[in-house]
Amino acid sequence: MPAKVLINGYGSIGKRVADAVSMQDDMEVIGVTKTKPDFEARLAVEKGYKLFVAIPDNERVKLFEDAGIPVEGTILDIIEDADIVVDGAPKKIGKQNLENIYKPHKVKAILQGGEKAKDVEDNFNALWSYNRCYGKDYVRVVSCNTTGLCRILYAINSIADIKKARIVLVRRAADPNDDKTGPVNAITPNPVTVPSHHGPDVVSVVPEFEGKILTSAVIVPTTLMHMHTLMVEVDGDVSRDDILEAIKKTPRIITVRAEDGFSSTAKIIEYGRDLGRLRYDINELVVWEESINVLENEIFLMQAVHQESIVIPENIDCIRAMLQMEEDNFKSIEKTNKAMGIQ
């Protein structure tokens, strides 16, 4: 029997997770929810998803009916049929859903990176914490930036012990569909204090990095991708070739070369379009080969993170771990990647 997955919040993350679940042969989407009758709600129905109203209120149901969008009921009409819920709600709403819906109905749930690490049993990355999250009820898939950092640090740590990491994050201002968030013409410290929250978020996945990782971040007026500059000190001697080989062996990381035309995040997104990727998603972390350098025992590199899609395969693996569908994290990763057509 395929695992029954409910997507609560058919937005930027939710619609991608719904499509990714539909690509797997061991799970299925039993429903998706929306809070308002917008074009995304209409498209969900047109794609064949059963639509439910996220807010259990008859007046809210009537809004959908008046808009001509058929709904199957509210989330309370489907919640107990689900083996697991993937929460795609906006920041802070996920915790409310956890306390008000998921826990009272005793259904497993995955929250996203906008929620607090302390609000769940554990924090998920397929490479680092799959086994820890195995069979747990309430887990958070960490944010896009943290996911990218976890992947690259896994690659480096596979060949040398990490002594410390110093990372500068250049964050996109907003997603492409966000017409409210800025800045439009500024570079904004985010936060103005150092360190930023990204280091502790990595530690929530990899506790052994406590005291070893420090991050700072700024926001720039772009919508396409985040970019990271890493300076990682390791214990022992490694070469540039060692690092490049480790990166290429790590799943969900791809390398690109500026000399091949990948001169910016815009070119990476264009690559996704030319590949025919749905929504031009780049689920893989992208590392520039030319940026990789080693000075004594310190590694330098630059990487790009597609914030809308990097966490999607992680959600799929998290479903398998929590529902105890596959014990081996690498087998789950391989299965997910093959179904989604990613590396």
UniProtKB/Swiss-Prot annotation:
- Could you name the active-site residues? 144
First-level EC class: oxidoreductase
- Write out the GO MF terms: glyceraldehyde-3-phosphate dehydrogenase (NAD+) (phosphorylating) activity; glyceraldehyde-3-phosphate dehydrogenase (NADP+) (phosphorylating) activity; NAD binding; NADP binding
Q: Which GO terms describe its cellular component?
A: cytoplasm
NCBIfam families in the record, alphabetically?
A: GAPDH-II_archae, PRK04207.1
Report the domain of life of the source organism.
Archaea
Alphabetically, which GO biological process terms does the record hold?
Answer: glycolytic process
What lineage does the source organism belong to?
Answer: Archaea, Methanobacteriati, Methanobacteriota, Methanomada group, Methanococci
Q: How does it assemble?
A: Homotetramer.
CDD domains, sorted:
GAPDH_II_C, GAPDH_II_N
Entry similarity comment: Belongs to the glyceraldehyde-3-phosphate dehydrogenase family.
**Residues reported to bind NAD(+):** 12-13, 114, 172, 307
Q: Which SUPFAM superfamilies match?
A: Glyceraldehyde-3-phosphate dehydrogenase-like, C-terminal domain (SSF55347), NAD(P)-binding Rossmann-fold domains (SSF51735)
**Which pathway does the protein contribute to?**
Carbohydrate degradation; glycolysis; pyruvate from D-glyceraldehyde 3-phosphate: step 1/5
Pfam families assigned: Gp_dh_C
Provide the E.C. number(s) assigned to this enzyme.
Answer: 1.2.1.59
The molecule here is called Glyceraldehyde-3-phosphate dehydrogenase
Its annotated compartments are:
Cytoplasm
Name the species this protein comes from. Answer: Methanocaldococcus jannaschii (strain ATCC 43067 / DSM 2661 / JAL-1 / JCM 10045 / NBRC 100440) (Methanococcus jannaschii)
Query: Which UniProt keyword terms apply here?
Result: Cytoplasm, Glycolysis, NAD, NADP, Oxidoreductase
